[in-house]
Amino acid sequence: MNRFRYLCSFAALAVTLLSGCSSPHGQPQKGSETQAPNEVLQFGPLYAQNCAGCHGAEGQGGAAIALADPVYLGIADEKAMRKVIAGGVHGTSMPAFAQNSGGMLTEKQIDVISNEILSRWSRPGILNGANPPSYAAKSAGNAQQGEVVYGNYCKSCHGADGQGGPKGSAITNDSFLALMSDQELRTIVIAGRPELGAPDWRGNVPGKPMSDQEVTDVVAWLASRRVPNPGQPYSASTFVQH
């Protein structure tokens, strides 16, 4: 009887030990492996890691333009968005994310981000009949005429010289203009910043939306206010030794 109990106990112990050897020694269990960064194809982690810091966790509320704005997505098609994500915007805070441009994202990952942004936040038909200005400028702008356009459409919020007003922030600030490309300025003029209370091209003057050329001209005026070396408020005399 004791021998039988001994054999049963030994058999149970053997089964327990063998069950822990179902995989080769040192090999991680299935499902426990850490996913390589270039294999992540879920929008959530890709957006959180690469986009949310500037554009906001839910596509709005960040320092950069809201991606969850249907008007913006109505003027910037997938091709334009993908180009910006992949190649960035030189001279601004928007970096290139494609591996062939020095970034960390694969072509598939960029596809996931651009496709999902449009799928989640666009609203098909939102600009039907609106005749919005084109996403990219069709011709050169006239800065002198742009100053007139600014006075008509922008001054009431941003102040006479663009240094801030009762409703809007400074948009001729040296550092601001240094961080914004002409295309970014154009996009904001057209799409607005609804999360900040800034209207799109239709809302500055009721019943009188901005024309394509007026948008182009006011961007030319803003661009003409850029300075070569922003962020250097001290004159050379400050550094003269006495």
What residue ranges belong to the model's regions?
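Flexible coil segments in periplasmic/lumen-exposed cytochrome c-class electron-transfer proteins
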Residues: 24-33, 37-41, 45-48, 95-161, ...
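C-terminal motif of bacterial Sec signal peptides marking the signal peptidase cleavage site
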Residues: 17-20
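Disulfide-rich extracellular modules and peptides
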Residues: 23, 53-56, 69, 115, ...
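Gly/Gly-Pro-rich "capping" loops immediately C-terminal to redox-active cysteine motifs
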Residues: 40, 44, 56, 60-86, ...
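Short alpha-helix boundary/capping elements
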Residues: 89-90, 121, 193
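Disulfide-stabilized extracellular ectodomain repeats and their linkers
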Residues: 48-51, 64, 91, 151, ...
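Bacterial N-terminal signal peptides that target proteins for export
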Residues: 1-11
